Amino acid sequence: MATNGVNGAKHYNEGTFLFTSESVGEGHPDKIADQVSDAILDACLAEDPLSKVACETATKTGMIMVFGEITTKAKLDYQKVVRNAIKDIGYDDSSKGFDYKTCNLLVAIEEQSPDIAQGLHLDDRLENLGAGDQGIMFGYATDETPELFPLTLLFAHKLNAAMSAARRDGSLPWLRPDTKTQVTIEYKHDNGAVVPLRVDTVVVSAQHAPEITTEELRKEILEKIIKTTIPAKYLDEKTVYHIQPSGLFVIGGPQGDAGLTGRKIIVDTYGGWGAHGGGAFSGKDFSKVDRSAAYVGRWIAKSLVAAGLARRALVQLSYAIGVAEPLSIYVDTYGTSDKTSEELVQIIRNNFDLRPGVIVKELDLAKPIYLQTAKNGHFGTNQSFSWEKPKALKF
């Protein structure tokens, strides 16, 4: 076995364990904020692919505020962009906790600081673009699913997506946009890899219209959402369902809780698996390595697993402001690779150019693709994203 990771330590081969991941639906207040920030980013990139955007959003009852630093040639109609994003989520009436037509929008956007901008100047060539900030970023992949993504979070995301679809197509018309899910899976250890055996617990909370009873809601969610989303082979007589454990959930969205951009970074990534460097994604253009390097970290980890170099992989990258090349590259394969860490890092260096200005070209990150990443996770669920398409590695 490899010298990196845990070398198949005894406890990695014995017994089972439970692991849990949570997700939130597009109408969750923090997710509204993420989507509004990314809608503004997309509006900038649609007109000016070199826009520099750092846009935060805060929301509470009847109010949404966008604030941050944006340098762009785009002519932005903030009222239109923000209200359309809220409308698309489904908040079109104050009885649902928010209304895109009547909410108060505050805009506090300034140009990017010249001190930060000078660290990023486009030299003459995009390749020489320095990182927009210091920081550490992680990517993770696992062979437990065809998507090479943790099954706990995949199911949690899919449950929220199913509720959104049922609300939009009218099959569950009493559903409202604010939903939360949590899935616990029993796994077995397999020489450092993890193998899902069964779903142990499913938690679903869904904002709803006042006319449906809790009893009816629980029945409908179980039959029309959970059992149509999670394959029957994972559900057994011991599976526990906590559907609407609080009882009523009529008041939701920003009326129920305040929302902020960047508050759902574990939902956005790997659901507690792997590791996280702390940087959020939404509202940031590709020069912010918090986002672009996390995407390339996923691309690297997924490519390593897809190539059969490991069954599980965690990759860390680090950057400094104004410096193009990463300061460090780390990889841990949890004992599932027959290559050493040094060999794997060399394979990464030989196959990936990790300068932000090259990442943007290879992954096509100057396009207005970001609003869709802010719904149901940036990884695993949407295989059309460029970073979800493994690179053919030479080694």
Curated annotation (Swiss-Prot):
Its cofactor is Mg(2+); K(+). Keywords: ATP-binding, Magnesium, Metal-binding, Nucleotide-binding, One-carbon metabolism, Potassium, Transferase. Its EC number is 2.5.1.6. Pathway: Amino-acid biosynthesis; S-adenosyl-L-methionine biosynthesis; S-adenosyl-L-methionine from L-methionine: step 1/1. L-methionine binds at residues 69, 112, 257, 288. CDD domains: S-AdoMet_synt. One of its GO terms (biological process) is methionine metabolic process. Catalyzes the formation of S-adenosylmethionine from methionine and ATP. The reaction comprises two steps that are both catalyzed by the same enzyme: formation of S-adenosylmethionine (AdoMet) and triphosphate, and subsequent hydrolysis of the triphosphate. This is S-adenosylmethionine synthase.
